[in-house]
């Protein structure tokens, strides 16, 4: 630290040799003494701060330089919350035209900006404007320290929008193209910190940062690559930005696909996450596959790194939404690795994305359906169905519901004893889980060539199909009531005597249907609907001469439509009993 004051003797410029006032000479003497015992003193208050402040306000350039260097060294070692009295002299130094002072003052402010409270106070005291001015200068060290300080300030949420609207983004974008790697790192890091809110991302895009970030994906520096891939990943969260990227950045996808093979694990992960966000749009779902993304993704979902597995399975999940990609994904060898991901019981997200992808692939071509069953996906999903978080159960039940829609899959599902999972799932308190399970169960009761498994599951497990029908008839939830009635009708239309007898001879089921018929009939009567002539409606609210009541009529229309549909199904069922 003694070197901070040694410049008093050597400089020859006029400001350096300005006469030193007595109070300044005293401050120098005191400061040298304080520095000898610096580990025992607080330089942010009392005598040490007063001595430093005296030097800051001196007309002698050497004294200002000494103060700046002292502040830089002290703040590097001792970082804590400070007062306005500490920041004010540093901000004064920041406005100096002397490069040495600028470098040291920016460094000191950047050091203090590590503290969360200081970040807010620096911006409140007008620190952004002089920092922006320093960024726009020619001195590389000054640029580097000024950008580093803004990077630190931008980690505080309260500051982000102020920085975004301060005029800092354009010089930051310019400095991101600097030939000096330290400046480039700090600038891209600062831009990344500005991508955590939609409003700030919009400012960033408007400042022209996107083409720079995309071009820097080719950087040989892993830090710059990481900052740029992460920033672009965040920018791609917004639909408007994805559309703009699609129009203006034709090489973005191919660059990100290449980075999935980066030696840096975090770059690889962020590139994959960026592709995941882009794949929210249909056009990108196709483009990622065309750019050769599948071989990288199938390798990454088998990685030992959980963040990489999560990023890659989330990406393939989005890509699998597009029907044209389904066969290509299956051919690329994803099915068995996806099934293995269902064993990640410590990661609910990985399980959810894996099941969701399997669901998207399940009901495509006959070839894919066959490979799906051969992969062990049904058995693994059945195994997890009753022993996994609700979010995973929801995805599994949706997968079963999709599979059960295809007539060619029904017997395979029944032979896999899927009813052992579906029936208990109908008890779930989560309506999505119970509804999907019930829909799958209903479809499996419709148009199958062999009803042996249906008959075996009539009253077991958990009261069996019979119990499910009775519970859903009593649910007071129109969707569930509809599923129960439709299932009963399918069983009665099965042309299987044993199945028909099970339904017809069950008083609880038949009484439930009759009660539903009575309730829906009364509901429709109260609404003025003649169930014997549905086209006739006595409700005055629908009368052309009473147009002011149209809103009232439209409010009740969905309920009336649901009641009419339920009533009609009950009548079809009851005809089988005559």
Swiss-Prot record:
PTM annotation:
Palmitoylated on one or more of its N-terminal cysteine residues by PFA3, which is required for vacuole fusion.
| Localization per record | Vacuole membrane
Q: What results from changing residue 51 to R?
A: Fails to undergo self-association in the presence of NVJ1 or ATG13
Residue positions of covalent lipid attachment, annotated as S-palmitoyl cysteine: 4-5, 7
- GO CC, alphabetical: cytosol; fungal-type vacuole membrane; membrane; membrane raft; Myo2p-Vac17p-Vac8p transport complex; nuclear membrane; nuclear outer membrane; nucleus-vacuole junction
Crosslinked positions (Glycyl lysine isopeptide (Lys-Gly) (interchain with G-Cter in ubiquitin)):
77, 515
Q: How does it sit in the membrane?
A: Lipid-anchor
Carries keyword Coiled coil? no
The principal location of this protein is membrane
Q: Name one GO biological process term.
A: macroautophagy
Any idea which UniProt keywords this protein has? Isopeptide bond, Lipoprotein, Membrane, Myristate, Palmitate, Phosphoprotein, Repeat, Ubl conjugation, Vacuole
Q: Region Disordered: start and end of each range?
A: 527-557
Q: Where are the ARM repeats?
A: 37-75, 76-114, 116-155, 157-196, 198-237, 239-280, 282-321, 323-363, 407-446
* Phosphoserine found at: 11, 16
- Residues anchoring lipid (N-myristoyl glycine): 2
Q: What does this protein do?
A: Functions in both vacuole inheritance and protein targeting from the cytoplasm to vacuole (cvt). Involved in the formation of nucleus-vacuole junctions (NVJs) during piecemeal microautophagy of the nucleus (PMN). NVJs are interorganelle interfaces mediated by NVJ1 in the nuclear envelope and VAC8 on the vacuole membrane. Together, NVJ1 and VAC8 form Velcro-like patches through which teardrop-like portions of the nucleus are pinched off into the vacuolar lumen and degraded by the PMN process.
Q: What is said about its interaction partners and assembly?
A: Interacts with NVJ1. Forms heterotetramers of two VAC8 and two NVJ1 or two VAC8 and two ATG13.
Q: What is known of its domains?
A: Comprises a flexibly connected N-terminal H1 helix followed by armadillo repeats (ARMs) that form a right-handed superhelical structure. the H1 helix directly interacts with ARM1 and hinders the dimeric interface. ARM1 serves as a binding interface for the formation of the 2-fold dimer of VAC8, which is crucial for heterotetramer formation with either NVJ1 or ATG13 and subsequent PMN and Cvt pathways.
Q: Tell me the protein's name.
A: Vacuolar protein 8
Q: Which organism is it from?
A: Saccharomyces cerevisiae (strain ATCC 204508 / S288c)
